[in-house]
């Protein structure tokens, strides 16, 4: 995972839609089965803003921004179906969104503005990672194992996560939609 450097007095955050149970357990198990070294560090999610470093004193303004974004967005439904990959550009296999793509795109654009504005490394494509930076055989196995996967859930909030010194991403604040 490409993580921006963090200095003393800074925090590394990410913004994401949490995948609810029982689906989170399924997706975590798939990532563990792929022997992804980050399987236990990153809960299943749909990224809205990748790892971003802020001065700790900017966090309150960032949370105000996120609250305004969330308040302006209605709840929506996500349907996950099947697998796809970013190969050969990036060694990632993911479960794809079949519904909720445009809503995620709109949320991502709104989140990635103002105090959280910045350039993207890749074009935004909402997904749930199940294997990342593992050997090709493990990527292929993850792709095949979850190819028939399907789940549907309502999204009524997103979360601000913080990357701890122990390498674990933990939710810090919830932002209800609508």
What are the residue ranges of the model-derived segments?
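Short beta-strand segments and strand-loop junctions that repeat across beta-rich extracellular domains
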Residues: 156-166
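Charge-rich, low-complexity N-terminal segments
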Residues: 90-98, 104
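Structural motif corresponding to the early beta-alpha repeats
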Residues: 77-80, 87-92
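Basic, often amphipathic N-terminal segments
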Residues: 1-77, 85, 100-157, 170-178
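Short strand-connecting beta-turns/loops that link adjacent beta-strands
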Residues: 88-89, 135, 165
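Active-site donor-binding loop signature of nucleotide-sugar glycosyltransferases
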Residues: 97, 163, 177
């Amino acid at each position: 995972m490409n993580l921006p450097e963090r200095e003393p007095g800074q925090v590394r955050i990410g913004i994401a839609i949490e995948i609810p149970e029982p689906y989170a357990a399924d997706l975590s198990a798939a990532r563990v089965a792929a022997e992804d070294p980050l399987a236990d560090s990153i809960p299943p999610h749909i990224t809205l803003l990748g790892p971003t470093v802020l001065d700790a004193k900017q966090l309150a303004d960032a949370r105000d921004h996120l609250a305004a974004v969330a308040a302006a967005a209605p709840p929506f439904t996500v349907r996950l179906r099947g697998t796809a990959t970013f190969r050969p550009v990036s060694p990632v296999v993911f479960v794809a969104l079949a519904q909720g793509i445009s809503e995620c795109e709109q949320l991502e654009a709104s989140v990635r503005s103002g105090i959280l504005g910045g350039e993207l490394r890749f074009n935004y494509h909402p997904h749930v990672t199940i294997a990342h930076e593992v050997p090709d055989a493990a990527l292929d196995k993850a792709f095949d194992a979850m190819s028939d996967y399907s789940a549907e859930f309502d999204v009524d909030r997103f979360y601000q996560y913080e990357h701890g010194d122990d390498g674990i991403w933990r939710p810090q604040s919830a932002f209800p939609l609508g």
